[in-house]
């Protein structure tokens, strides 16, 4: 049985990966009176006077909404809200299994930015945080920014920031392996969508001075036509030498390549044109921009992908459960750049320096201390 056949069979057997489980026994009239009427009126009255009491008396304190419109799902594209539900259920499972957080999948049947913002705003009182998922660019940028500005709970688009955090964590350790400094590195980020933009922003915040973004059109510069508003904004802080040309041109003399783009678009010749001891993260899924063996053969020293069957898996699951765990426990109202940097450093630190190697730069997702380490790092930077 193939993986695809097994996955389909199991999803049919599961009939959904989630269920509601009661924490409250209802085995007697007294149980019923306490869990529901008339006893339930007492916490209602307290919360009516002070909405913050909802964190004490309801599941809000440890529950997030996983919200999608199904417009940019994995490598499947715009498949809509019904087809997106298995992914959102899966995300909720990861929240619970890796972070101990309750998560509710919500798939919205609209692509309208205003309607999505309204829907999430109306739903927000029941949740301690909002995880936006698989919403296409550039709409995702506006949706997140406006929700962050209006809601008093953390709003986090994991496709952007979770990806950026794990990429930075991997690069921090890879630089130790190859003995380079961030100030001396040229970075090429291929893919100027949600993940590529967020990765670039976080690398800039961390202190990389020389980043060139590329997209289908090649190098993204101030002269590139057809850019969306966010891509245009990124030209103001990237490509300091105003390079032009193709991806191949951008990779010449680069020290770090991060791909969040398309399968098979990086050649061995491109990798060979990079500087010695190059770091290459080919994160297109399921087929990376270049296969790891070919990248190493062409001269790359540290190679990461998004896949679990290769060394150096760069996967969001080591980030988002701990980030939300810390944000919820610390009652953060936002997830800030400081918290993202702290999370990346915490993830990187989970691989002891004496164990770092070309093929070991990322912590294993199943290490029990990952979420707690990230959560503590996030909590230490909460300044509400």
For each predicted feature, which ranges?
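Short, ordered loop/turn segments at secondary-structure junctions
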Residues: 69-71, 79, 108-109, 134-137, ...
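Adenosine-phosphate binding glycine-rich loop
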Residues: 158, 282-384
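Glycine-rich phosphate/diphosphate-binding loop of Rossmann-like nucleotide-binding domains
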Residues: 74, 79-99, 157, 165-262
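Rossmann-like adenosine-cofactor binding region
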Residues: 232-302, 307-309
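Solvent-exposed alpha-helices and their adjacent loops that cap or buttress functional pockets
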Residues: 12, 55-60, 96-97, 122-124, ...
